[in-house]
Amino acid sequence: MTATDRTPPPLKWLCLGNRDANDGFELFAHGIYARNGALVGSKLSLRERRQRVDLSAFLSGAPPLLAEAAVKHLLARLLCVHRHNTDLELLGKNFIPLHASSLGNAGVCERILASARQLQQHQVELCLLLAIDEQEPASAEYLTSLARLRDSGVRIALHPQRIDTDARQCFAEVDAGLCDYLGLDARLLAPGPLTRNLRQRKSIEYLNRLLVAQDIQMLCLNVDNEELHQQANALPFAFRHGRHYSEPFQAWPFSSPAC
């Protein structure tokens, strides 16, 4: 498969904001588990039927204006699930992947806030899984957006793309009391040079000591095989996610236009 096969042409995304949020999309959930194996939540993704595109990566890396359209569609799907399945507990906590920079778009924040209020009527917990890969310190505007979201009942999971640098970017959010979870990708635990592994282990253990005092729990993402499971199990992760534990499932077929 070529890069072109994986990445849709930019023009295709321009129609997202104008399309009916109930047309042609499927919502998938991928389980998040506690150390004892209990299902506690789901990482959500949205797939477009006609283009056969998984929007989860798009949500994490899109420019803010396009991210707003993707958020609109995913939240519309999620609301539809809970309107028609009032006893649905399988999704648990709903983790939505989004790039932290997208919170600079007022439309994204307003869409999330409005949806959070609606989901709370169904006793549904919404959590943003915010990808962080910037070197600049967190801006006052960004922290203000986080505060608004948390005050409205939205949980925040920070997802730094590296341990040695980006994890430090989380400290402003942590110090301000604006973080509920810290997510790290299992690829950071992959075997490598001993010095690197020791440095990463010490970084993770240090982060855990820093976070546990503030009741912030750690989540290991994309644990896709037994080796990564063993690595994650040896470290203080409260929750794990990945194909080692389960495959993504379609939350609702959405074959009916009733939503």
Swiss-Prot record:
Signal peptide positions (record): none
Report which superkingdom the organism of origin falls in.
Bacteria
Task: Reply yes or no: does the keyword GTP-binding apply.
Answer: no
User: Membrane topology type, per the record?
Assistant: Peripheral membrane protein
GO biological process, any? positive regulation of DNA-templated transcription
Compartment list: Cell inner membrane
What InterPro entries does UniProt report for this protein, alphabetically?
Answer: EAL_dom, EAL_sf
What Gene3D superfamilies does this protein's entry cite?
A: EAL domain
Q: Kindly report the protein's main subcellular placement as a broad class.
A: membrane
Which cellular component appears as one GO term in the record?
Answer: plasma membrane
What are the record keywords, sorted?
Activator, Cell inner membrane, Cell membrane, Membrane, Transcription, Transcription regulation
The function of this protein is: Positive regulation of toxA gene transcription.
Annotated protein name in UniProt:
Exotoxin A regulatory protein
Q: What organism does the record attribute this protein to? A: Pseudomonas aeruginosa (strain ATCC 15692 / DSM 22644 / CIP 104116 / JCM 14847 / LMG 12228 / 1C / PRS 101 / PAO1)
Classification lineage? Bacteria, Pseudomonadati, Pseudomonadota, Gammaproteobacteria, Pseudomonadales
